Amino acid sequence: AFRRTAKAIAEWVDAVNVTDGQGAHVRMASWAGSLVLLEEGVEPVMQVQCRDRNRIALQSDILSAGALRVPNLMMLGGDPPSAGDDPDAKPVFDLDSVGLLRVAKSMRDDKRLMSGREVPNGPRWLLGAAENPYTPLSAGPYDRFAAKIAAGAQFVQTQFVFDVPGFARFIQEGGLHGLGVFGAQIKDVAHFDAT
């Protein structure tokens, strides 16, 4: 079903998010879904979340994405296991999304793993992050956003845009520094499951 859907949408989309255990539910691995999309001529945005893997496994998955020539990685913290279909699962969170961005940027730019070991043929990716544009201003929402930019985010995806003035405030006050921001609109989003 996943491959069939990829074929059907190939000419209609610029890129497709491939989630990584979205909502703390068991799904196809994001690198595998990304490979299917690449084979069908669809550009993937491979999501990598920190909930289920330690830094060794995360770096291994990122290296695998590079070997498969996945062009875009989006680093996420991950939903808590209690939100999913197996609430007794133990979360890992060895890194957070900012730390994972730093790691991927170092692997790409410095050709180094966290251990300092060299990555001979450093992968090339566009690195992204997610941001909630509706966090109350009193919560200091842009500190974490600024940290993601400093860590290497080159694009940001937001949650669905229902409040256009609130989204405009985020764009104006968020300190985007030339970053590409993709505000998700319901009419532009095609959802299909990689189960």
Residue ranges and their predicted role:
Residues 1, 22, 44-56, 125-140:
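Active-site mouth loops of central-metabolism enzymes
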Residues 1-18:
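Conserved N-terminal beta1-alpha1 strand-loop-helix module at the mouth
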Residues 15-17, 43-47, 72-74, 124-128, ...:
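Structural preference for beta-strand elements that scaffold enzyme active sites
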Residues 16, 65, 148, 152:
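Conserved, mostly hydrophobic/aromatic
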Residues 16-26, 48-50, 74-76, 154-163:
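Catalytic beta/alpha-barrel core
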Residues 24-36, 54-60, 80-116, 138-140, ...:
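Active-site-adjacent beta->alpha loops and helix N-cap segments on the catalytic face
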Residues 50-68:
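Glycine-rich anion/phosphate-binding loops
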Residues 176-195:
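N-terminal low-complexity segments that are often proline-rich with Ser/Thr-Pro
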